[in-house]
Amino acid sequence: MSLHTSDLVLVPGQQLPPLETISGFQVRPGFFRFFGATVIPGGVNFTIQSHGATSCELLLFHKGEEEPFAVLPFPEHYKIGFVYSMIVFGFDIEEYEYAYRLDGPYDEKQGLRFDPAKILLDPYARSVTGQSHWGCVNHASHGYRARVTHNNFDWGDSRHAQIPMEDLIIYELHVRGFTQDSSSGVKCPGTFRGLEEKIPYLKELGINAVELMPIFEFDEMRNARLIDENQLIDYWGYNPVSFFSPNSSYASKKEENNEGTELKHLIRTLHANGID
């Protein structure tokens, strides 16, 4: 059997056997095409790309802890080109967070600023810790870290309406601003669920498509400042933290990764009502 899984196909329900142990975890080379963290039978596939890195480490943390409880260096044969990939078996999705450390050259003229001590957020993270409450500064000294999310949402037969461009009636909106005020009359103001509650209103207006202002994870407090005793924050969201992570402050429930589930539920319900 080839040591690499780059040429293998992930078959639903099929669990590949681990091949070795690193830092107490059973592992094997991963599926290099699956960037980010992907749940597979028996474990999680971690894949990250870096053009300049000479080494890569996967850091595992207990939820909320400052220091990693395990550091898993990627062996050289877990790398193809610029891509590192590893399957970690026995990964506890509910209790663990993860991040990376990358080493490499430091040459600002070439745009390279590798720091082997710097803890890095996965650029393909699908859920991020540290920003679940709107308008609150992330005081954690470790900054942002990633969570692994389940990929078992039931989309049913959800399909977008495929409305011709010339027939679209588009409503652009800010998820928080659309329902945050009490006049919206929703149970979950300022959230994906709050927007879902307003679908009948959108249909009354004749809307058949919605365009959402940034819904990825962003840090509204990054450039916060007081002007005339008014707190100004980055309300609109053009200050990204993680492009692939739904904004956790837009979740009505603050359980880990509920933002992803609520966003998917919103999309499914919009489609069911003929709205793209």
Residue map of PLM features:
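Loop/turn elements at helix/coil->beta-strand transitions in domains of secreted/extracellular proteins
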Residues: L168, L205-V210, A272-D276
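The feature marks proteins involved in alpha-glucan
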Residues: S2-P41, F69-A70, Y78-V83, G90-E172, ...
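A conserved hydrophobic secondary-structure block that centers on an alpha-helix together
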Residues: H174-V210
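Structural beta-strand segments of beta-rich domains
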Residues: G42-F46
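Short proline/glycine-enriched turn/loop motifs at strand-loop junctions of beta-rich domains
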Residues: Q49-S55
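Carboxylate/His-rich catalytic cores and anion/metal-binding grooves
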Residues: L202-N230
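Conserved, mostly hydrophobic/aromatic
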Residues: I48, Y100, L173, L202, ...
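Aromatic- and acidic-residue-enriched carbohydrate-binding clefts of CAZyme catalytic domains
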Residues: S184-C188, R222-A272
